Structure formats: C-alpha cells, structure tokens
A protein has these predicted regions:
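Face-selective signature of the C-terminal outer-membrane beta-barrel domain
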Residues: 1-143
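Flexible, surface-exposed loop regions and adjacent strand-edge segments
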Residues: 2-14, 76-89, 143-153, 191, ...
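Transmembrane beta-strands of outer-membrane beta-barrel pores
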Residues: 69-75, 122-124, 133-139, 185-191, ...
Length: 411
C-alpha cells in the first residue's frame, strides 16, 4: 500500500502502483482506496462591544472594550471505499466500506476572549495601546475505527488549555496632510492543538513606515520584523502530511522585509472617466533560528539559517482601471517569485522548487441600478501554465483560464 504522494514523487520505483492509478492496466479488486472525507462543523457564540469617546482640551480620547465567547466543533465520521480500475480508466466499487471505520472523532474548542483599546489623539500624535486576553480549552474525543455507533467503549480523549495576554502598541505622527510616520509593536498569537502540553505560537512583531502624498501620487512604505519564539506547523494532507491535523512546535524563526504601495490617478477629480493605477511590491526574508529534524514534509530537516518554505522573496502586483459612474474595468498583473518547498539555503534544488510566475486577470462590473450590478471575472487571461505548490502529492497546477459571471446586490 502506497500513498499517492509517494507514487507521484517516484513513479519509476513504484511503476506497478503508477500504472494502476493512471488506468493503464486492469487492476485487482481493492487496488485503489478513496477516502470519504466526511465532516460536519458547528459554531456558536455571543459577543458585545462598548465604545466611549470624549474630548478634553486639545486631546481626543476613545476607549473600546469587547467580550466574546464561542464554541467550535468539528465532527469527522469517515471511511475508505475500495475500487478496481480498468485499462480504460473506469473505476468500479469493490468494497463498500462501513461509515465511520476511518477517522471517527470530535474536536472542539471553548474560547473566551476580551480586549480593551485606548486611542489618544493629541496635536499631531496618535497613540493606540491595547491588550487582548484569550482563554481556550481544546478537546478531542476519538471513538476509534471499531465503534461506529459511538458507544464510547474505546473512547480516547485528550485536552489542552491556554490562557494568554496579547498586548500591542501603535503610534502615528502626522507632519502635515501629505506626510506621516507610523510604527507599532504587537504580540502575535496562534492557539495550539489539543495535544496536552503543546505550546501556542507566539511572536513579537515590529513595523515602521510612512504614508505620503505627492500631487496625484499616494504611497505607503513599511518595513517589518517578526520574531517568532515558537512557530507552529500542522500535519495537514494539504501540506503533504498524514492529515491527522496534529500541530507541532517548530521553534524560533525571524521574518523581515519591506512593503511598498503606490497609487496614481491619471485623470482629474472632476473628469467623467477615472484611470487609477496601483503598484505593490513585497520583499520577504526568513530564517530559522534553531535546528531540528522534522518528519513533516513541509519542513524537512532544519538547520539554523534555513529559509521557511513556501514564502517567495519577491511578490509584485499592479492594477490598472477604467472607472465610470455606469461601469468599471480592471486589469491586474501579479508576480510571485520562485520559492522553496523544503527548508534550506542557497540555490533551490529542482525537485524542491516552485518556479516564478506572472498571471494577468481581467474583471469588469456594470451598475444596473444603485444596488444591482453585473460582474465578470477572467482568471489567468493568457492561460499560462504554472505550478502553484508541490503539496499535496507533487506539483499542483495553478488556476487555468476561467470566466466567472454573476449578479451583485447590495442592501
């Protein structure tokens, strides 16, 4: 028995398996297993927010307080049917599996969150400190593959809890209507899985930037640095894992870079037609700060200084629009640089690389009334063939040429 990822990664070694999955031979019964990824989701909760602001002298004050409780649940009741396949590519059911004989478990989370933010505007300064508190209890009830009626005879449970304060601080100084500086320091947080003792993802995130106006040109430039003290990974089928959904701690990572956004309008403010253009660029640099061995395909064996996988160093996008009171047309170009699919440094090996791509999209909208409009979107206008990922199960193609139309109604 071999998974599709192993077969596609090395079709020469698994030639017999490959001939079965591509339908070039008449297989035996039960040669192919197809999993019914049956899941149900349930979510409920309540939240409230209180906002109060006032003026005193030259200062503006605003306080916001929020509370939220919610419960989320995922119910997996899955099975694997078995098939044979003919040399003409026709699959025939040979074993109709009993429902619930694969993943048969309920995962849930009870979460309470609260926050308070305070905004102070004084002369040219704006300060925005705040803090959030999260308290989460995560549970899993696994009934096992042999208890499809969920009597609990083989019930295995596990639980993990986390409580954390998440502070942050932002500041902005406005020199005039055309130029300002801003910065911030914020704690980042992502909850752990339901494995007992697993730590949450935590980071300290810094940013410093400027916003400016130069005539018709508007822009924003930001530098950022994210210091992860504990990065989380997930065992997902979508990332080449087993699909257990278990999370694992991947240690310390630094992420830094710059972002640039420019907007320009070629027309005057009183013109019937508007011709805006926007350009955005992001440079991202990543580096693990510790070494570890990982059985998860997303990381591989990691050494200090290795780059994070699936993060391109260079990303670029631009949009040009024609806007009128009755319609708008937008053409967008997006570039994603090459990226590695396993942690590493230096030149990226061919079998661990997803090449760069540039895709052009076209969209349009016609306003029938103030509330009703028709939309048209053309994805990958030039029908470029490109790879988007190497997981799950080898190279995955990006979206081919496609046309989508619809109606948009606003209340």
């Amino acid at each position: 028995k071999k998974g599709i990822a192993d077969i596609l990664e090395d079709p020469s070694t698994y030639a017999n398996h490959f001939s079965i999955v591509n339908g070039s031979v008449n297989s035996a019964a039960d040669a192919i297993g197809v999993k019914a990824n049956n899941r149900k989701y349930y979510s409920t909760g309540i939240q409230t927010k209180l906002d109060y602001h006032w003026y005193k002298g030259n200062a503006f004050h605003d306080v916001e307080i929020g509370l939220r409780y919610h419960y989320d649940e995922e119910d997996r009741f899955q099975w694997v049917d078995k098939y044979s396949i003919s040399s003409t590519g026709v699959m025939s059911l040979t074993t109709d599996a009993i429902e619930g004989t694969d993943a048969n478990r309920i995962s849930s989370a009870n979460a309470f969150a609260s926050y308070i933010t305070y905004k102070l505007k004084y002369n040219n300064w704006t300060f925005t400190p705040g803090v959030r508190y999260e308290n989460i209890t995560l549970q899993r009830e696994d009934f096992g593959k042999n208890d499809v009626n969920r009597t609990g005879v083989n019930l295995a449970t596990r639980e993990n809890s986390v409580g954390v304060f998440i502070p942050g601080m932002g500041a902005n100084y406005k020199f005039n209507n055309d130029f300002s500086l801003f910065g911030g320091v914020h704690k980042g947080f992502s909850p752990p899985g339901n494995q007992d003792g697993q730590a949450p993802e935590e980071s300290i995130n810094y940013e410093l930037g400027t916003r400016f106006n130069l005539g018709k040109l508007q822009g924003e430039f930001v530098s950022f640095f994210n210091d992860y003290s504990n990065l989380l990974g997930s065992d997902l089928a979508a990332t080449g894992g087993t699909g257990s959904l278990d999370q694992f701690n991947a240690g310390e990572v630094n992420v830094n870079g710059i972002e640039l956004l420019l907007n320009y309008n070629f027309s005057n403010s009183d013109a019937k037609f508007s011709f805006p253009i926007s350009v955005g660029y992001t440079f991202t640099n990543t580096a693990f700060q510790n070494s570890f061995g990982s059985a998860n395909d997303l990381w591989g064996t990691v050494a200090i200084g290795d780059e994070l996988p699936y993060i391109p160093k260079h990303q670029f996008n631009t949009t040009f629009s024609i806007e009128h009171k009755d319609f708008e047309i937008n053409i967008n170009g997006r570039f994603n640089g090459e990226f590695r699919t396993l942690a590493g440094t230096g030149n990226i090996p061919n079998n661990e690389r997803v090449d760069a791509n540039f895709i052009v999209d076209l969209s349009g909208k016609y306003f029938i009334t103030k509330r009703l409009s028709t939309t048209l979107n053309v994805i990958n206008l030039l029908d470029n063939t490109y790879a988007a990922s190497r997981v799950p199960a080898g190279l995955r193609p990006g979206h081919p040429f496609g046309i989508y139309g619809g109606l948009e109604f606003s209340f």
